[in-house]
Amino acid sequence: GVRTIGLCHGVQGGHRQIAEAFGLKKEEVDIICAGINHQTWYVQIRHNGEDLTGKLLEAFEQHPDFSRTEKVRIDMLRRFGYYSTESNGHLSEYVPWYRKRPEEIGQWIDLGSWINGETGGYLRVCTEGRNWFETEFPNWMKEPAMKYAPEERGEEHGSYIIESLETGRVYRGHFNVRNNGVIDNLPDDAIIEAPGYVDRNGVSMPLVGKLPLGPAAVCNVSISVQRLAVEAAINGDDKLLRQAFMMDPLVGAVCNPNEIWQMVDEMLVAQEKWLPQYAEAIAEAKARLAEGKRVPTKEGYQGAARLHVKSVEEMMQDREAANRNAGESDKGKERAKVSG
């Protein structure tokens, strides 16, 4: 088969935050992260041999920006003892506690900072970026060609992995691979994220040991949801699909079983042409829905935290921001710092 690893830049982003919170440079702080993608935890933080892990909460609580923009992550740090790699709003989408009621979302999520937990946030910024790109691309083609210089090299893993495979120069990063015992208390067949080393021989993953019990519990919920969803999709088993929905933290936070069953019926019918494996289940769902909706729904509801999609004319008011959004593949790289 094809040798494959998964790559993410969440570890690097949180690493920068941690260093800033302590008033240090990123290269002065050593970290070990372990978990699953988007639920990876900084289980060890060291500076000059000193373990700073237990001092991180105070550092974040006292930081003028992070204390406002990272409230979910800080609260998880407070209650679970470890900081998560995932951005504040996105982390709120993996656990059941911070999006239970629309009126409470603003207490945890700063919607003025990037797409930090807004409903359909990625869709909004990508729609705006696409529309702006189509408008502005002819002007971009008139600009000088981009120069690739070593000092401008970013933190994405890809080029460093290629360099290590070709030259043997060792590179340390955090990679997504099949567990195979790297993290003791997560399933062997789960895809985990943990430290690894790359050289001419490929990627080597040292053993991490046990993940702290609380973070492991959070990871295992998502692993269970993913396992149910995969088996449902492969086998066209709508019962497993419904169980996956029930186990999903956000769904379970706001929906009862009857609401979940009807929601799955509606979603299966709406996406019928892409889901041939569910043909029998979709026919049954159509019959149930034809009898009349059993649960009242909010017609036209757009979600609890949706923001306006800007037109090209509106984006013209800030061309620099629009160009950055359209040209940057990492939509979280340039987060606006707005005063609270």
What are the functions of these language-model segments?
Residues 1-16:
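Rossmann-like NAD(P)(H) cofactor-binding subdomain of soluble oxidoreductases
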